[in-house]
């Protein structure tokens, strides 16, 4: 489905009924990335998927923008579908938007789930983004600069056939000049992002997940989130990289649904 935000077409999907769960994509993801997760995540919940500006089936923008427009698109979506509040999940780039949305619209968020994300674009992450941008001259260069480091080394090695299939799909996509131009704008939209001094303003129940081999948003950044967000819990996943949803899909789904659908928050033991 499409709704209009200003002059942009924003694509979204709704699956199932129940307590609403809104999923915010990582930077290279789209609503299609969640195909294998729709069935379990919509069994007891209204699952809401959305492509950010520049992603998937939403409009592309080749002039530079920043996170604030993505935050406003999330709010416009909830107004469009007339949902007063949601459980909000964000992974990586989507987690950054989720944090800013929660700070701006705290009454809209029942629970917050942050996976493999951070409170600021560090010098490290900015240089990673610069490396991605410098590799956009060819599909294979972009693939080799981005994809291997999203996964843990063990997963990458042990799933060579799966990775080669992904490579065959992604390299032609990364050769598309409009795609990589849009990706550069998305990557640069995170420059200057920093909410570290605002994290103590978040009061909603929050689950934070970090992984042992996350080379994009290292675990110390999830630890920082946990240290500064009151009423937050931190889960450390061994033997996984940045793309936990693909490396450990069953565990990932169990964590999300267990946290979202557990109605008991305080235990007096």
Regions found by a protein language model. Give the residues of each.
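Conserved HGGG/HGGXW glycine-rich cap/lid loop of the alpha/beta-hydrolase fold
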Residues: 7-60
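Active-site loop/oxyanion-hole signature of alpha/beta-hydrolase fold enzymes
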Residues: 48-89, 254
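Gly/Ala-rich beta-loop-alpha elbow adjacent to hydrolase catalytic centers
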Residues: 90, 94, 98
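Flexible "cap/lid" loop of the alpha/beta hydrolase fold
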Residues: 99, 103, 110-139
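Conserved alpha/beta-hydrolase catalytic His-Asp/Glu region
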Residues: 123-125, 143-198
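Short beta-strand/loop motif that positions the catalytic acidic residue
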Residues: 202, 208-210
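Acidic catalytic loop of the alpha/beta-hydrolase fold
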Residues: 212-217
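Catalytic active-site module of serine/aspartate enzymes centered on a nucleophile-bearing elbow/loop
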Residues: 232-269
């Amino acid at each position: 489905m499409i709704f209009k935000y200003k002059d942009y077409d924003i694509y979204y999907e709704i699956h199932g009924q129940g307590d609403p769960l809104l999923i915010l994509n990582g930077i290279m993801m789209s609503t299609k990335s969640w195909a294998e997760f729709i069935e379990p995540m919509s069994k007891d919940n209204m699952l809401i998927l959305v492509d950010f500006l520049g992603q998937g089936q939403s409009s592309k923008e080749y002039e530079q923008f920043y996170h604030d427009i993505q935050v406003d698109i999330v709010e416009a979506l909830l107004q469009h579908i007339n949902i007063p509040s949601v459980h909000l999940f964000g992974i990586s780039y989507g987690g950054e938007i989720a944090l800013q949305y929660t700070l701006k619209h705290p009454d809209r968020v029942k629970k917050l789930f942050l996976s493999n994300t951070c409170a600021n674009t560090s010098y490290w992450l900015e240089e990673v983004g610069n490396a991605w941008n410098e590799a956009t001259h060819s599909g294979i260069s972009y693939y080799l600069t981005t994809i291997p480091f999203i996964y843990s080394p063990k997963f990458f090695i042990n799933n060579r056939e799966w990775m080669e299939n992904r490579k065959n799909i992604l390299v032609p996509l990364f050769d598309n000049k409009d795609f990589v131009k849009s990706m550069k704008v998305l990557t640069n939209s995170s420059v200057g992002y920093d909410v570290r001094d605002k994290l103590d303003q978040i009061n909603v129940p929050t689950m934070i997940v970090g992984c042992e081999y996350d080379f994009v948003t290292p675990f110390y950044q999830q630890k920082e989130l946990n240290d500064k967000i009151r009423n937050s819990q931190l889960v450390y996943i061994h033997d996984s990289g940045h793309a936990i949803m693909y490396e450990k899909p069953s565990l990932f789904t169990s964590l999300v649904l267990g946290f979202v659908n557990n109605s008991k928050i305080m235990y007096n033991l």
